[in-house]
Amino acid sequence: MAEDAPAAARTLTIAMPKAGRTRPLVAIVADNAGTETTDFIVPYAILKRSGAVDVVAVSADEGTVELMPALRMLADTTFDRFDATVPAGADVVIVPALHRADRPAVLAWLRKQAAAGATMVAICDGAEVLANTGLLRQRTATSHWYSREGLRRRFTETKWVDDRRYVMDGNVMTTTGVSASIPASLALLGVLAGPSAARETARGLGVQAWSDDHDGGRFGVTARVVAIALMNRLAFWRHETFDLPVESGFDELTVALTADAWGRTWRSDVVATADASVVESRHGLRLLAQPADVRHVRVTIPAGRRGDSALPGVLADIAARYDDATSSWVALQLEYPK
């Protein structure tokens, strides 16, 4: 049975939609130099799929957005154009992990949106970006397991917690590592559009639960993890490039999780391939693609792999091609309990 929204003590404050809007407007931020693949695409896919909110992808600059560790895309608009066309600002701003957590232009835009009344949501290490704006002062927050101790030392006015998948504190929400993007997006949807919208969307994705329960203490670096990571990185002669075919109307969530996981093995790179240079997803995400290369391995996504089954399926594929240690290394990076 699907989970309802978290208890009242863990709630997110969202004002009524601004400027006479009938539905909330959610802006998802991208920095062109580097934006985490799943952190960005999963909230986009889930919120768009619901049909209950308006979603816009906003990049700092014009042109290509490099996703990390794989894929490239085009945003819908830029900070400047968004400000010109939506002077009242967004109702909600989602901040993925960014290559630069301290870029002045990004921090200034986030502060501006917050000052205009936007609720701020950070996915994974997007929490560091929000912390750099000062918006996490006197808040309870979380982030990726690897980053939390460093964040505790740097941002002492924030209470950092390990045991919650996502944390809602007033008008700010933060999440743990990459794989938290699915439950956190459904929880956010429940606040924005009601529990029934979250349940219906989750049902379509095959997701059964999205509570904030989390055992953060199970994630950490061990000698075995270090050994497999170094071995994969240094054995360059074994590195591969995978072609990930995409077609018009592709499922964003499954493509994102597939590319993200394979891109974290430290043995493989992933590129989207298609006949067209720009391929639009089911819900309007514009992915940049290149022609397939016969020298590359082809990644296929089995029919029926979606939602909660997507990541376990990819991790099983990685274990089959490489080994279970590499699959576990990827799961650790994604803060996914394997």
Task: Identify the function of each model-found stretch.
Residues R137-D162:
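A conserved active-site-flanking secondary-structure segment within enzyme catalytic domains
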Residues A127-E128, E149:
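Glycine-centered loop/turn positions within well-structured domains
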Residues L136-T140, V172-T176, A187-L188:
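Flexible, glycine/proline-enriched loop segments at strand-loop-helix junctions
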Residues M1-M120, E128-N132, D162, P183-K338:
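Extended, subdomain-level signal for the structured scaffold at the beginning of enzyme domains
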